[in-house]
Design a protein with these regions (language model features):
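Glycine-rich flavin
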Residues: 2-4, 20-27, 32-166, 194, ...
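Short hydrophobic core segments
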Residues: 7-9, 113, 128-138, 173, ...
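Flexible, glycine-rich terminal cap/loop adjacent to redox cofactors
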Residues: 7-35, 40, 47, 51-58, ...
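N-terminal Rossmann-fold NAD(P) dinucleotide-binding loop
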Residues: 15, 179-180
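Gly/Ala-rich phosphate-binding loop of Rossmann-like dinucleotide-binding domains
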Residues: 19, 23, 183, 187-188
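Short, acidic, Ser/Thr-enriched surface-loop or helix-capping motifs
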Residues: 110, 285-286, 388-390
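FAD-site-proximal beta/loop scaffold in flavoenzymes
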Residues: 149-167, 249-322
Length: 445
């Protein structure tokens, strides 16, 4: 029996950041991981996807070469080199996490860990005991129960990241973040991309106006969208779906299922520890503690917010709670980004949410086409919406366009400090920068 102050199951962003924070504050930590350090985000999610998106962005710029005075520009897309660059990025960051797991106070154990009881974990036949346990096992791709889902040409985002060549025809089932990012990237790589989505609009967590404008912009680049369409079956290269009461089909060489993710709750021994959970995730309170005192669940596995940075900050919160330290993290101010081209980002409430909750709110817009830096960059397609209460306190910000994530991040900081629109008006912004778009929106109040 090995005793330690804190056990963490899972070495993704939530797990390894929690371990680092705890070790820096003098706790002995044992981290268990049955795959690769870094979790889904680093190995088969955020990071490799963003590497591909960057390649796609460069290709899009090359196609606009004549607008920059680059006449008769020629280039050849070598997807193998694109994949190799993506893998180098992943391996560099993974090496950094591996090094982090060797810092004083952290013991890193490779293998599948299960709870024996509320204080004991078993891995590789060895038992480990701690007064506090953090479960950070993440999530996996959710597969829809339809005929043909098990075909070799039907893949999840994990498998799509490892394809050796660009598919001539790619059908994406689902227009959430994963589906939209891959639609944007593979369209740039040369695929004929079709997206089939059950809902009325793409990116349901995004402001509906922003989501519609983004979809329309991506459509202009050749991506075909079928909204309010339910997939019925897959047979060979044929995807059959129903839309507006009519059955339709689309042909594809590769079919990506991007219908969301589900928490990894199986095979952890949660029942033995008496933890309340369901297939929708582990139930936690405001401190991310389960019904069993001393056992916490952070990140995708609690399904509160399936974002890597959400997992990290939930982990910081938990460690501070264990240490008895005050925690001022504003979890309700959770920015997110979609790295399509152009990209989109969001924080806080949308206009629709304000209306649904009966909140008197004011919304003002600022357009990229009126910004000097956007014009100089030839990135004039974009919009930023700023939403505030009648007293001026900022409730949300939603944008699409070049570097939208960076613009929304500024507003996230302001929201964490309960900044008002009038206070934002008094903050000097560098000229010419895209950040002036945020200020322009404030000046419209």
């Amino acid at each position: 029996m090995t005793k330690t102050d804190l056990i963490i199951i899972g070495a993704g962003p939530g797990g390894y950041r929690s371990a680092e924070h705890a070790a820096k504050h003098g706790l002995s930590v044992t981290v268990f991981e049955d795959k690769y350090a870094g979790g889904t985000c680093l190995n088969c999610g955020c990071i490799p996807t963003k590497a591909l998106c960057r390649n796609a962005e460069i290709i899009d710029s090359l196609r606009e070469g004549e607008e920059y005075g680059l006449d008769e520009l020629s280039y050849k897309i070598d997807f193998q080199k694109i994949a190799e660059r993506k893998q180098r990025v992943v391996e560099t960051l993974r090496s950094g996490v591996d090094t982090l797991m060797k810092m004083p106070g952290i013991t890193y154990v490779e293998g599948h860990a299960e709870l024996k009881d509320a204080r004991t974990v078993v891995c590789n036949g060895e038992e480990y005991e701690a007064q506090n346990i953090i479960i950070a096992t993440g999530s996996s791709a959710k597969m829809i129960p339809i005929p043909g889902i098990d075909q070799e040409n039907v893949v999840t985002s994990t498998e799509l990241l490892d394809v050796k060549e660009v598919p001539e025809r790619l059908c994406i089932v689902g227009a959430g973040v994963i589906g939209m990012e891959f639609a944007s990237a593979f369209s740039s790589f040369g695929s004929q991309v079709t997206v089939v989505e059950f809902l009325k609009e793409c990116l349901p967590t995004l402001d509906s106006d922003i989501a519609k404008r983004l979809r329309q912009q991506i459509s202009k680049r050749g991506v075909e969208f079928y909204m309010q369409a339910g997939v019925k079956a897959i047979s060979g290269n044929t995807v059959t779906f129903e839309r507006k009461g009519k059955e339709q089909t689309v042909e594809a060489d590769l079919i990506l299922i991007a219908t969301g993710r589900q928490p990894n709750v199986e095979g952890l021994g949660l029942e033995r520890a008496g933890i309340d959970f369901s297939k929708r995730g582990i139930q936690v309170d405001d401190n991310f503690q389960t019904n069993v005192p001393g056992i916490y669940a952070i990140g995708d596995v609690n399904a509160k917010c399936m974002l890597a940075h959400a997992a990290e900050f939930q982990g910081f919160h938990v460690v501070n709670h264990i240490l008895g330290k005050p925690c001022n993290i504003r979890h309700e101010v959770m920015p997110s980004a979609i790295f399509t081209h152009p990209e989109a980002a969001s924080v806080g409430m949308t206009e629709d949410q304000c209306k649904e909750q009966g909140i008197a709110a004011v919304c003002k817009k600022a357009f990229f086409r009126a910004n000097g830096k956007a014009l100089a960059m030839n990135e004039t397609e974009g919009l930023l919406k700023l939403i505030a209460r009648e007293d001026g306190r900022i409730l949300g910000c939603h944008a699409y366009g070049a570097h939208a994530a960076d613009l929304v991040q500024e507003v996230s900081v302001l929201m964490c400090r309960d900044t008002t629109v009038d206070e934002l008006k008094d903050m000097v912004h560098i000229h010419p920068t895209l950040s002036e778009i945020v200020h322009d929106a404030a000046m419209n109040f």
